[in-house]
């Protein structure tokens, strides 16, 4: 059950609690291995952590195209939604780019200064595909890079068994967690492949985890070195992005996903509970948090969470997140709620209130 706390019971460390101590040592070894052994290291970690350890990494463009065509045929509404999302994101990113004014000025006689905004040559995108492949991440990372005019967009995403290899893998009882199918063709989640094709990314590598981040940061025989790496991931991906910062640029150290909802009694407890669970189902260490001044409302949301967990298909993951990392915090005022939000600086901030 989600914890209900008074404001004075919240530990100060919680506000800055993106702690990757247990992951740092692991990723340092991964980075060292990738630098020294390149593709061989990527294959070693793929065989250890993924359901597939392909013989090579670059997914054929024909497979990307086929995935997009399959999505259009089998799930036309989803296909249209991805296309529309790409269109909207491209418009917004293009407007952002236009807002960066280039200029030159003579600040003193004979002394000229200025500003010129240019895209990086090669951007690396990481798209998770663990419990839930994140098609939306493709749109939110690839599309801005395309709008910015990046010459080459490289994507890494965890491997899957290629359709051509599925019968062989199934016959051998392979291609499942703990029993990877090795040596097949590179492939990935079909939704991610389809979205990559729709958004214009044609270089997709079947490589996941911290080893993919290290591969993009330092380059291997197969994966080119990039200038900047963007995209979310688990704590090992986040720790690796933090470790390679300086060698390459990064967007941010995101860590486990989180939502922070400021709500009052005018909100529907069922809706608030659903939003908390929508984040909780991502990861067992996701942080679903609600802040309110009304303890009665907090208890109604807590009860609604328990009710919805009974029928949630992702309840196993969501339950662990809610019990271990979930919080409902009772504050004295909305001003204190805003203060907590500013201190936490969450990935997702939601206001569910009348005013």
List the predicted regions and their residue ranges.
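Glycine-rich phosphate/diphosphate-binding loop of Rossmann-like nucleotide-binding domains
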Residues: 136, 146-165, 183-187, 263-271, ...
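Conserved small-residue-rich beta-alpha loop and adjacent elements
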Residues: 105-192
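Short acidic-hydrophobic, aromatic-tinged amphipathic segments that line or gate anion-handling sites
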Residues: 3-7, 203-208, 328-333
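Conserved C-terminal structural/oligomerization subdomain of aldehyde/semialdehyde dehydrogenase
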Residues: 322-355
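N-terminal Rossmann-like NAD(P)+-binding subdomain of aldehyde/semialdehyde dehydrogenases
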Residues: 1-121
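Flexible, acidic loop-helix segments that line cofactor/substrate-binding pockets
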Residues: 60-76, 253-259, 282-298, 303-330
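Conserved NAD(P)+-binding/catalytic subdomain of aldehyde/semialdehyde dehydrogenases
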Residues: 174, 197-287
């Amino acid at each position: 059950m989600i914890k209900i706390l008074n404001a004075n019971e919240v530990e100060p460390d919680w506000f800055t609690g993106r702690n990757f101590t247990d992951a740092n040592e692991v990723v340092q070894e991964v980075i060292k291995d990738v630098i020294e052994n390149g593709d061989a290291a990527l294959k070693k970690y793929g065989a250890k952590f993924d359901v597939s350890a392909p013989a090579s990494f670059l997914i054929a463009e024909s497979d990307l195209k086929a995935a997009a065509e399959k999505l259009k045929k089998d799930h036309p509404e989803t296909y249209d939604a991805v296309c529309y999302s790409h269109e909207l994101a491209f418009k917004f990113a293009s407007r952002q780019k236009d807002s960066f004014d280039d200029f030159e000025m003579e600040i003193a006689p004979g002394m000229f200064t200025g500003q010129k905004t240019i895209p990086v040559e090669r951007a690396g995108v990481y798209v998770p595909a663990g419990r839930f492949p994140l098609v939306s991440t493709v749109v939110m990372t690839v599309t801005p890079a395309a709008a910015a005019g990046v010459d080459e967009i490289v994507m890494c995403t965890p491997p899957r068994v290629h359709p051509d290899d599925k019968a062989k893998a199934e016959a051998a009882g392979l291609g499942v967690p703990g029993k990877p199918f090795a040596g097949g063709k590179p492939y990935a989640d079909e939704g991610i492949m389809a979205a990559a094709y729709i958004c214009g990314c044609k270089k997709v590598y079947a490589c996941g985890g911290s080893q993919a981040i290290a591969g993009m940061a330092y380059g291997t025989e197969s994966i080119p070195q990039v200038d900047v790496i963007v995209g979310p991931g688990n704590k090992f991906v986040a720790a690796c992005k933090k470790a390679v910062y300086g060698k390459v640029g990064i967007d941010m150290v995101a860590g486990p996903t989180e939502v922070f909802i400021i709500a009052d009694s005018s909100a529907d407890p069922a809706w608030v509970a659903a939003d908390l669970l929508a984040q909780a189902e991502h990861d067992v260490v996701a942080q679903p948090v609600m802040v309110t001044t009304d303890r009665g409302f907090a208890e109604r949301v807590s009860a609604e969470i328990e009710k919805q967990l009974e029928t949630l298909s992702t309840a196993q993951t969501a339950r662990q997140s809610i019990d271990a990392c979930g919080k409902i915090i009772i504050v004295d005022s909305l001003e204190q709620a805003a203060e907590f939000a500013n201190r936490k600086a969450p990935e997702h901030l939601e206001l569910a209130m009348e005013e």
